[in-house]
Structure formats: C-alpha cells, structure tokens
Amino acid sequence: MFFTCGPNEAMVVSGFCRSPPVMVAGGRVFVLPCIQQIQRISLNTLTLNVKSEKVYTRHGVPISVTGIAQVKIQGQNKEMLAAACQMFLGKTEAEIAHIALETLEGHQRAIMAHMTVEEIYKDRQKFSEQVFKVASSDLVNMGISVVSYTLKDIHDDQDYLHSLGKARTAQVQKDARIGEAEAKRDAGIREAKAKQEKVSAQCLSEIEMAKAQRDYELKKATYDIEVNTRRAQADLAYQLQVAKTKQQIEEQRVQVQVVERAQQVAVQEQEIARREKELEARVRKPAEAERYRLERLAEAEKAQLIMQAEAEAESVRMRGEAEAFAVGARARAEAEQMAKKAEAFQMYQEAAQLDMLLEKLPQVAEEISGPLTSANKITLVSSGSGTMGAAKVTGEVLDILSRLPESVERLTGVSISQVNHNKPLRTA
C-alpha cells in the first residue's frame, strides 16, 4: 500500500527488499504490509532557548547568557538525513530538541570561557558567530543544521556589568565636563582673537581706505592724462579715419566702375559667344554637314573610280593577254610565211627578190605620195615655161615614181631592171 508525508516529514522504509532502507522526504512510497516497516521522522524547525547560568569568563567573572537557536533535521541532504535517522529515528521532537540544546549549551559555555565580559558585552556579533560556527560543525554530524543563533541576554549577580556602566557613565560625564571647559576656554580665546582681529581689521581697513584714496587720486590723475591723450588721439584718429573713409569711398567707386566695366566686358563676351554659337548653328554646322556629305560623296566616287579602274585594269589585262595571244599567233603565222618565203627565195633567188620588190613597190609609191594626199591646198608657181595645172602636178609625181627603181637600188643594192633581164622564162 502507499504511504505519503508532507514536506516537513520524512519516511524510512525497511524490511524485505529494502536494504539499505529507503528514505523519502516529502513524498510517497509503496510499502508491502507485514514484510516491510515504515517509520517517520520530523523535519520541523526547532526553537531552542540556550541558557548558560553563572559561567566564568576568561578573567573569572561569572555571568549568565541566554541565546536563541533555530535548528532542524536537513531532509534535502541524503547523508545528513541518514545520520539523523540513525541517531533520532523513533524519538520525539522534544527528545531531539533536548539533545541539540545540550550540545549548543556546551559550546556556548566553551565560547564564554574563552572571552572576557567586555568582549561578550561589547561585541555580541562576534560571540554569536563563534557559537554558530562551533555548534554547526558538531551538530551537522548528527544530521542537524543550525539555521540561526542570536545572543538574547547577558546578566550577572555581582553588578559587574552595572559597574562597567557606571564607570562608562562617569567617564562620559568627565569627558563632558572637560569638553565643556575646553569649549568655554576655546570660546574665550576665540572671542579675544575675534576682538583683536576686529581692531586689526578696523586699522587695516582705515589704512586700506587711505591707500585706496591715494591710489584713487593717483589713478585719477593718470586717467585724466590718459583721457586727454586718448581724446587728442581720438580727434587725430577721427580726422585720419575721415580721410581713410574718403579714400576708401573713392576706391570703392573706382572698384565699382571696374566691376561695371568687367560686367560690360562679360556681357559683350557673352554676346560674342552667343553670336558665335548662332553663327555656328546657322553657318558652320550646315557647312560642316555639307562638307561631311561631300566627303562621303567623294569617298563613294573614289571607291567607284577605284572599282572602275580595277575593272578597266582587268579588262586591259585580259585584252592585253588576248592581243598578246593574237600577236603571237600572227607572229607564228608570219614566221611560217617568212620561212616559206625564205625557202622560195632560196629556190628562185633573183626571181623571188624581184617578186618581193614588185610586191612592195605599190606600198613605197603610196608612202611617197602620202604627203600629197594629206595636203589641203597646193599652190603652183610657174616660171613661164613648161606645162601648167594638173599636168604639172602629174608630171612631178611621175618623175618621182620614175626615180623609184633608182632609190630602191640605192637602198637595197638590187637593180630591178637587171633582175628583170636575167629572169628566166616560165614554161607552161
């Protein structure tokens, strides 16, 4: 069956299958009846009134001290809970409180024996801290933690503390009387010093007033001299300033004129620039556009001429090749003809020569009469004897032609008449 407990209580289950025993602080646990056992231990805080009656201090003065301590079994620490269960399981809260009280009282007595009455009385915090420290280290082994410790009361049966209070009161009263006398003395001294300082201050004040009056008179005279000097300087400076002002006004006027002239020049320059831009817009840009157009046309014509020239060059080259081929063919034909003529000349010799001369004579006669055919006008001058008119011209031509065989003989060394006489008769 299940058992539960609050946060101020712990349960310890022992018996079958519970070795070591199970400790649960503020929770629930399952217990098998008859074969398992459950026990509870309180975790409540215990308030202890620790009284130590007539304990002799370090100087042998017996006093009584009462302290208040708060202690409890620590359930969150498993080791301390186990130690508390070993020592206090089955005991009531009163029994646990009595054990803790006896332990605290013993430590409190030990601390009192090592301190004087004055130390305990004057420094209660130190006494409380020492008791808390020593008692905590001892009670923690029992599973009990000291939550707090405070010294509540100190008293004795021999009026030792009262005597300490009287002595302190007398000392305080003595110090008060001494302080009062010293204060009165200091007040008289300060009053005498104040009176002396007052007289000294009055004398010094009168001296200072005299010095001040003297300084005032001297400074006034100095100031008067300086004022007159400054006034004269001011008058002179005023005149100089007036002259400078006039000069500056004149300079400003000149500068204004210069600025106006500069502005006029700037306006004229702007007008010139505007006219130049207008001229450029109306004349230069169209001229440049026309020049650009003409340049493009010239480049186009140039390209066209180059193409035409290249085409003509190609045509000339092809024509030249054709003419060269024709000339070559004609030369070959003439060479073949000349070769045949040479063979015929070799065979017929003088007859062939005569045949060739007779063949060329018409051409020679044509060349001789060529100048006459190209003449536009012929003027005949007669000496009065012989024929006249066309008969005269015809006679001249015939005379030239009759001299043709003689010219051929001079040129070639061949006589036409001789070759003709020696020519053999052809047989049919």
From Swiss-Prot:
It is found in: Cell membrane; Endosome; Membrane, Caveola; Melanosome. It is a peripheral membrane protein. GO terms for biological process: axonogenesis; cellular response to exogenous dsRNA; dsRNA transport; extracellular matrix disassembly; intracellular signal transduction; plasma membrane raft assembly; plasma membrane raft organization; positive regulation of canonical NF-kappaB signal transduction. Induction: By optic nerve injury. Brain, retina and skin. The modification Phosphoserine is found at residues 19, 163, 385. Disulfide bonds: none annotated. One of its GO terms (molecular function) is ionotropic glutamate receptor binding. Keywords: Cell membrane, Endosome, Membrane, Phosphoprotein. Signal peptide: none annotated. GO terms for cellular component: adherens junction; apical part of cell; basolateral plasma membrane; caveola; cell-cell contact zone; cell-cell junction; centriolar satellite; COP9 signalosome. The modification Phosphothreonine is found at residue 387. Pfam families: Band_7 (PF01145), Flot (PF15975). Belongs to the band 7/mec-2 family. Flotillin subfamily. May act as a scaffolding protein within caveolar membranes, functionally participating in formation of caveolae or caveolae-like vesicles. PANTHER family: FLOTILLIN-1-RELATED, FLOTILLIN-RELATED. Heterooligomeric complex of flotillin-1 and flotillin-2 and caveolin-1 and caveolin-2. Interacts with ECPAS. This is Flotillin-1. It comes from Rattus norvegicus.
